[in-house]
């Protein structure tokens, strides 16, 4: 008896094992055990099995949720929350081993000594992420990192990561694919990008330590950038005049300043560099959100419509950048990611989301020289076809890369944004007032450069290049606005960006992803709940209309209403109906037998009035005679027909109680016997009967 239960209680054993052990224990013979506990097994095993099944399901679901969350959460944020422990070895790794640093537990972790200071990362991060990331991006990163080996470890590491993706496109997890695409495009655009590289390299000279790395980085940046509108790559060069014009350069600068630990990209970006870029941008824009800002990723090469890239870049611009908006013509497009040359400290793309760290970057590093303007036609036209080809892929990549952004859904503009920006720069137009921060979808793009912003928006109107601005209210937005470091951004519009509109399904995915970046404990929400929480005002309006339509659909149809109400008919119709009813009634009445038939069948007696009166008179006479012949009471008593006494017994009301519980209302057995006897005597004497039939006259048994 003891063994089977003990075995059944052991959680480690599988249900099948439990059965086997129950049946074949060491102590008793298997056959005996089987017969003995077959009933017990029926009672307990289903419960045990059910319990184990539920736990298996729970494990599976928890694994899936963990996988999703780990894919969504930037490592730096997880470290902040204490979910992950920071790897102490990371800081010590030399640039030669970028691949290891990039993929810790499948997460691309930025390489750099500065990062070691960031919160501890847990090795428990699901290894599944590693499978998600593709090996190709890692190899690319290694190559790029290797090129920067001359720089100090921190610089070299930070720069390579930044380099692969131009600052405009902080890539998200899809980066692996987007990265490959960007490389392929980079080859195509290398010719066009050559000018940008040259400019970047020249400007880089200001930073002696990072010059070699910067040049190589600039090249890589151009390669990755070329897929995206050329203008950005070109602006990057101007920006590099202060040694960090290109995104890669900006990252290099942070390396010099150890106090700012670069955020650890826990993003799905296989490219740590891209992850870093995105995180650095986020750190400036959204302190709460480590995930990269909407800035389009270069990783989305062609996929990232120029609008994405420029918008993303814009989000990172600081107020000082906006002052210089007018000065940057071409540079402004690339600069959006690179903080435009601004005396005030631009948002270091390399910097982790924490606001305090952003200030350390010298404003100088991000100054961009606007004078260098590249003909808009140069790379733009070459890259436009590629981008349009890849627009198909945009939705997915955008989702992945923008996953951290709370305010995402927007439309894919018919014309690439970089072209629009180019047009806006070329055609000076009055500056339109920027929308308030409440307009979530209004991009910083429109606020980064005055002429730039107005031009782009007005061009959208005049040339029917729709930049649709949607107000997307996400729960995290208000928190982010409150937490945004004042030094990094003076305007509320920080979290806003213009993004190509995505298909509805992609939008929902993005919203789910952005939800993962919210501060606080990770809450597992149902998909329905998430959708509801992110419904915009427009969605609510549509929903209201839908519900109204549903209610209207539920209204009874006209034929149904006619069934329950008298339809309005003309007089002729009424007469026709009346005639039909009359015909049916006549037909029914015609089926009744006639009086003649009834008389023949003796059912109806033929009578006239005289006969009836005579009948009545006869009845009356007969009755009166009977009454006159009625015997009196005395006669009846004398003839013993009436046997009761001629007195009436009267009782007081209080004495007469019909309630059954009173003793005087109950007949005693003697009373009952007397009643039976009297009745029997009356019945027997009521009528003369033969002796043999006498027993039939008994009314009650005595």
From Swiss-Prot:
It is found in: Cytoplasm; Cell projection, Lamellipodium. Residues 106-120, 147-156, 301-318 have a biased composition (Polar residues). Keywords: Actin-binding, Cell projection, Cytoplasm, Developmental protein, Neurogenesis, Phosphoprotein, Repeat. The modification Phosphothreonine is found at residues 358, 432. The modification Phosphoserine is found at residues 116, 118, 131, 147, 270, 291, 342, 344, 427, 443, 453, 464, 514, 516, 557, 590, 628. Residues 508-518 have a biased composition (Acidic residues). Residues 1-38, 82-194, 222-363, 473-536, 592-615 are annotated as: Disordered. PANTHER family: PHOSPHATASE AND ACTIN REGULATOR 4, PHOSPHATASE AND ACTIN REGULATOR PHACTR. Binds PPP1CA and actin. Regulator of protein phosphatase 1 (PP1) required for neural tube and optic fissure closure, and enteric neural crest cell (ENCCs) migration during development. Acts as an activator of PP1 by interacting with PPP1CA and preventing phosphorylation of PPP1CA at 'Thr-320'. During neural tube closure, localizes to the ventral neural tube and activates PP1, leading to down-regulate cell proliferation within cranial neural tissue and the neural retina. This is Phosphatase and actin regulator 4. It comes from Pongo abelii (Sumatran orangutan). The lineage of its organism: Eukaryota, Metazoa, Chordata, Craniata, Vertebrata. The gene is PHACTR4.
């Amino acid at each position: 008896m003891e063994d089977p239960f003990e075995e059944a209680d052991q959680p480690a054993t599988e249900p099948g094992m439990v059965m086997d052990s129950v049946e074949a224990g060491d102590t008793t013979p298997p056959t005996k055990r089987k017969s003995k506990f077959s009933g017990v097994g029926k009672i307990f095993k289903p419960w045990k099995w059910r319990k184990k099944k539920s736990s298996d399901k729970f494990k599976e679901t928890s694994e899936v949720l963990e996988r999703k969350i780990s894919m969504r959460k930037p490592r730096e944020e997880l470290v902040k929350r204490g979910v992950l422990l920071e790897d102490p070895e990371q800081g010590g790794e030399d640039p030669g081993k970028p691949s290891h640093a990039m993929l810790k537990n499948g997460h691309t972790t930025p390489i750099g000594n500065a990062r070691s200071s960031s919160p501890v990362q847990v090795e428990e991060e699901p290894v599944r992420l590693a499978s998600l990331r593709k090996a190709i991006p890692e190899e690319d990163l290694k190559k790029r990192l290797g090129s920067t080996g001359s720089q100090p470890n921190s610089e070299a590491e930070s720069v390579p990561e930044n380099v692969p993706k131009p600052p405009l496109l902080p890539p998200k997890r899809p980066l692996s694919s987007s990265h490959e695409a960007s490389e392929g495009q980079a080859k195509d655009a290398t010719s066009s990008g050559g000018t940008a590289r040259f400019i970047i390299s020249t400007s880089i000279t200001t930073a002696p330590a990072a010059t070699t790395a910067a040049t190589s980085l600039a090249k890589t940046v151009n390669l990755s950038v070329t897929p995206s509108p050329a203008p950005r790559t070109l602006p990057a060069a101007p920006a590099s005049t202060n040694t960090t014009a290109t995104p890669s350069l900006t990252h290099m600068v942070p390396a010099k300043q150890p106090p700012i630990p670069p955020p650890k990209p826990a993003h799905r970006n296989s490219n740590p560099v891209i992850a870093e870029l995105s995180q650095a941008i986020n750190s400036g824009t959204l302190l709460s959100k480590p995930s990269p800002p909407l800035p389009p990723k270069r990783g989305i090469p062609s996929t990232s419509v120029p609008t994405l890239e420029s918008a993303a870049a814009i989000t990172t611009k600081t107020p000082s950048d906006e002052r210089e908006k007018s000065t940057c013509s071409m540079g402004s497009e690339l600069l959006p990611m690179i903080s435009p040359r601004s005396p005030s400290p631009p948002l270091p793309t390399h910097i982790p989301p924490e606001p305090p760290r952003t200030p350390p970057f010298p404003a100088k590093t991000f100054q961009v020289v606007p004078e260098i303007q590249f003909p808009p036609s140069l790379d733009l036209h070459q890259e436009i076809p590629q981008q349009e080809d890849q627009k198909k892929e945009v939705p997915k990549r955008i989702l992945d890369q923008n996953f951290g952004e709370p305010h995402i859904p927007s439309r894919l503009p018919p014309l690439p944004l970089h072209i629009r920006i180019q047009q806006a720069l070329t055609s000076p137009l009055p500056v339109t007032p920027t929308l308030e921060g409440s307009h979530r979808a209004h991009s910083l793009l429109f606020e980064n450069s005055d002429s730039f912003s107005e031009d782009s928006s007005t061009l959208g109107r005049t040339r029917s290049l729709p930049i649709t601005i949607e107000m997307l209210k996400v729960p995290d937005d208000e928190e982010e606005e409150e937490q945004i470091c004042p030094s990094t951004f003076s305007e509320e519009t920080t979290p806003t960006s213009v993004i190509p509109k995505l298909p509805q399904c992609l939008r929902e995915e993005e919203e789910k992803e952005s939800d993962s970046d919210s501060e606080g404990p990770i809450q597992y929400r149902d998909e329905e709940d998430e959708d509801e929480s992110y419904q915009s005002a427009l969605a609510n309006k549509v929903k209201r209309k839908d519900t109204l339509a549903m209610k209207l659909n539920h209204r009874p149809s006209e034929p149904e209403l006619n069934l329950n109400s008298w339809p309005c008919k003309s007089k002729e119709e009424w007469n026709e109906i009346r005639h039909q009813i009359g015909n049916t009634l006549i037909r029914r009445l015609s089926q009744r037998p006639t009086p003649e038939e009834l008389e023949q069948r003796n059912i109806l007696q033929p009578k006239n009035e005289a006969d009836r009166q005579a009948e009545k008179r006869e009845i009356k006479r007969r009755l009166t005679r009977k009454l006159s012949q009625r015997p009196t009471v005395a006669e009846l008593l004398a003839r013993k027909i009436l046997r009761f006494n001629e007195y009436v017994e009267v009782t007081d009301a209080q004495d007469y109680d019909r309630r059954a519980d009173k003793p005087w209302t109950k007949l005693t057995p003697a009373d009952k016997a007397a009643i039976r006897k009297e009745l029997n005597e009356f019945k027997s004497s009521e009528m003369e009967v033969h002796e043999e039939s006498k027993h039939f006259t008994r009314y009650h048994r005595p």
